[in-house]
Swiss-Prot record:
EC number: 3.6.5.-
UniProt domain OBG-type G: residue ranges: 160-334
Protein name: GTPase Obg
Species this chain originates from: Azoarcus sp. (strain BH72)
GO CC annotations, alphabetized: cytoplasm
Lineage per the UniProt record: Bacteria, Pseudomonadati, Pseudomonadota, Betaproteobacteria, Rhodocyclales
Pfam family, one: GTP1_OBG
Domain Obg intervals: 1-159
PROSITE patterns: G_OBG, GTP1_OBG, OBG
Length: 408
């Protein structure tokens, strides 16, 4: 199946049903009053991440999706049936944005993640809602609200831990075949790889990582030259980049150092964050060099290239040096994942503390308010008691005057 990593679609939520303007009509009840029901809500459109999908090809041919309209309200206060929602399934890693405003809507980075794309319209009100003491037979009703309509841009960024980059024919596809079960096409000509390939590398039963191979880059890729610039987005979610270099090119005019530095410059032009990712240098095709020439060739390359974070020397075709590289990658990724989990746990703990503090402050405020209310009630009771005593005293004085008429 051809790989599609970009698409544009239109989603339209259902309109709400209209409210009804009807009146109760029964035998012996000449003026039954209004009984129009509300319209049903319109169906909404949702997106869900599905790990069983790996391309947006479905959305290149069908581009418009419309949810069901809500039914109109009926007599006898019958509500209209709500419209059916629709759910669109996308590959994990799909980024959805509004095509008109450019506003990001969702990043479906976790399998099963569900996001609302377009909200269905509310149903209209029946005339039953407009009955009042001065209008006993209203004919007013409201129409259903229109559902949301949005034009969306879909962009798939594959979820991989390690990304491969390099010039065409640097041996990237051969490397991914050597370390995983992926079987991309390989050949002795440039641009053998025309679309991204993913491979799962297992270092033991419980440890693995995903590696992504994209078409080779050439100088000027950031401005649109070649194929690789179309797929650089797939490296943005990776934790580390492997920069493969052909250390033994067939063409004597090819300078591996110049080509390697050109790739680094294209990364910088395309995306600064991608340029700043951890990047390991992998010197490939050592099997094409005589054993006594390998060390001098590697030393000369590193001296001309400049400082590197880490470098490895391999032969992807013969598997030489690949085992040490993948175990180094696994250790690095385990450390990265542990750091990510620790940061996430720290954020969750901080959020729990914030919520606990807010709850404590709210409880204290409620307790203070309750105490103030109790104090106010006590003062009111004291005032009532004083008023009652005063009234009793007045009543006693009045009774005394009535009992002794000579006291005047």
């Amino acid at each position: 199946m051809k790989f599609f990593d970009e698409a544009r679609i239109e989603v339209v939520a259902g309109d709400g049903g209209n409210g009804a303007a009807t009146f109760r009509r029964e035998k012996f009840i000449p003026r039954g009053g209004p009984d129009g029901g509300d319209g049903g809500r319109g169906g909404s459109v949702y997106a869900v991440a599905d790990r069983n999908l790996n391309t947006l090809v479905e959305y290149r041919f069908k581009r418009s999706f419309r949810a069901e309209r809500g039914e109109n309200g009926g007599s006898k206060d019958c509500y209209g049936k709500g419209g059916e929602d629709i759910t669109l399934h996308f590959p994990v890693g799909t980024v959805i944005s509004d095509l008109d405003s450019g506003e990001p809507i969702a990043d479906l980075d976790v399998d099963g993640k569900r996001v609302l794309l377009a909200q269905g319209g509310r149903g209209g009100l029946g005339n039953l809602h407009f009955k009042s003491s001065v209008n006993r037979a209203p004919r007013k009703r409201t129409m259903g609200q229109e559902g949301e309509r949005r034009n969306l841009h879909l962009e798939l960024k594959v979820l991989a831990d390690v990304g491969l980059l390099g010039m065409p024919n640097a041996g990237k596809s051969t490397f991914i075949r050597a370390v995983s079960a992926a079987r991309p096409k390989v050949g002795d000509y440039p641009f053998t790889t025309l679309q991204p390939n993913l491979g799962v590398v297992r270092t033991d039963e419980n440890r693995s990582f995903v590696i992504a191979d994209i078409p080779g880059l050439i100088e000027g890729a950031a401005e649109g030259a070649g194929l690789g610039h179309q797929f650089l987005r797939h490296l943005q979610r990776t934790h580390v980049l492997l920069h493969l270099v052909d250390l033994a090119p067939f063409d004597p005019e090819v300078d591996p150092v110049r080509d390697a530095l050109a790739i680094v410059e294209e990364l910088r032009k395309y995306d600064e964050s991608l340029y700043n990712k951890p990047r390991w240098l992998v010197l490939n095709k050592l099997d094409l060099l005589e054993p006594e020439d390998r060390a001098p060739r590697v030393a000369a390359f590193l001296e001309a290239y400049g400082e590197v974070e880490r470098h490895f020397e391999i032969s992807a075709l013969q598997g030489e040096g690949c085992r040490g590289l993948i175990f180094a990658l696994q250790d690095f990724l385990d450390s990265e994942r542990a750091n990510i989990h620790a940061q996430q746990a720290a954020r969750e703990a901080e959020e729990r503390q914030r919520l606990a503090a807010a709850q404590s402050a709210r409880s204290a405020a409620e307790a203070e308010a309750l105490e103030a209310d109790l104090a106010e009630d006590a003062l009111a009771e004291d005032a009532l008691a004083e008023d009652a005593l005063a009234e009793d005293a007045l009543d006693d004085d009045a009774d005394g005057e009535d009992a002794d008429p000579n006291a005047r």
